[in-house]
Amino acid sequence: MAMNVLQSPSRPGLGKVSGFFWHNPGLGLFLLLLGPLMWFGIVYFGSLLTLLWQGFYTFDDFTMSVTPELTLANIRALFNPANYDIILRTLTMAVAVTIASAILAFPMAWYMARYTSGKMKAFFYIAVMLPMWASYIVKAYAWTLLLAKDGVAQWFLQHLGLEPLLTAFLTLPAVGGNTLSTSGLGRFLVFLYIWLPFMILPVQAALERLPPSLLQASADLGARPRQTFRYVVLPLAIPGIAAGSIFTFSLTLGDFIVPQLVGPPGYFIGNMVYSQQGAIGNMPMAAAFTLVPIILIALYLAFVKRLGAFDAL
């Protein structure tokens, strides 16, 4: 039986183009990435550099206007005692939240990686990620109610008989306040709750790659559990901890909503940027303040890169 074979019409022009890109794969890759690179370079880096450049403009306090006269006054103003306190306050909170997140995340990540599987592991994944599905502002407002005077936290401590300890703790000048919701401790707890999942998941992924044979070999060689943790587990988990710390450190450093809702009076860097740009209209000073977290995060990324953080992302 005869069969009719349908042949597509020849397209010599298309074949030449295809052959050209076949012999020049680098050009094809360049054209493929040209659109995303232009978007990333113009929209992201272009707007960022424009913002930073405005940090050298002049702001007239009398007319409340910005003039393109270049000056270093805004950069020098960052080293004023009041602005220096804002930077130090923000940096201290970011470091404290990062360290506490690593300490709290490690046991849960270890249990998820070594002792769960199947449905139980899926349950833990959902439990860790579930708070991330809720609105950020809703979570922050919810914590203001939990930590308020006569709130759930105070009621719980009363029933445990720990209210005198809380009262004594709130009298401390650095972390205390009238209530938990107006204390530095309360602000720290809210930051810790919101950013903790960003630490748990990278640490769990790093521990998941830890071969059980290494733990068995360490035990066979006579190492105690403490020695195994120090010389085997911890070095292999450091890239995951460093990867998680990128999120906790940078997100705390740039946050302005939690410091506005919870904690004692006192600006963070994000609050200062919002205040200078939104309330006062001093865009040069706001741009100068944005330079601070950029430099701090760049230095931190250079540090954690040496710890293998990018390999664990």
From Swiss-Prot:
Gene Ontology terms: biological process: transmembrane transport
Give TM segment ranges: 26-46, 93-113, 123-143, 155-175, 188-208, 231-251, 253-273, 284-304
Residues exposed to the Periplasmic side: 47-92, 144-154, 209-230, 274-283
Q: Which UniProt keywords apply?
A: Cell inner membrane, Cell membrane, Membrane, Transmembrane, Transmembrane helix, Transport
What is the membrane topology noted in the UniProt record heading this document? Multi-pass membrane protein
Can you say where in the cell this protein is located?
A: Cell inner membrane
Q: Which Gene3D superfamilies match?
A: MetI-like
Residue span(s) of domain ABC transmembrane type-1: 87-302
Cytoplasmic side: which ranges? 1-25, 114-122, 176-187, 252, 305-313
Task: Extract the InterPro entries matched here.
Answer: MetI-like, MetI-like_sf
What outcome is recorded for mutants in which this gene has been deleted?
Inactivation of the gene does not significantly affect natural transformation.
In terms of superkingdom, the source organism counts as Bacteria
Purpose? Probably part of the ABC transporter complex YdcSTUV. Probably responsible for the translocation of the substrate across the membrane.
Q: What does the similarity note say? A: Belongs to the binding-protein-dependent transport system permease family. CysTW subfamily.
Indicate what this protein is called per its UniProt record: Inner membrane ABC transporter permease protein YdcU
| Species of the source | Escherichia coli (strain K12)
Q: What is the lineage of its organism?
A: Bacteria, Pseudomonadati, Pseudomonadota, Gammaproteobacteria, Enterobacterales
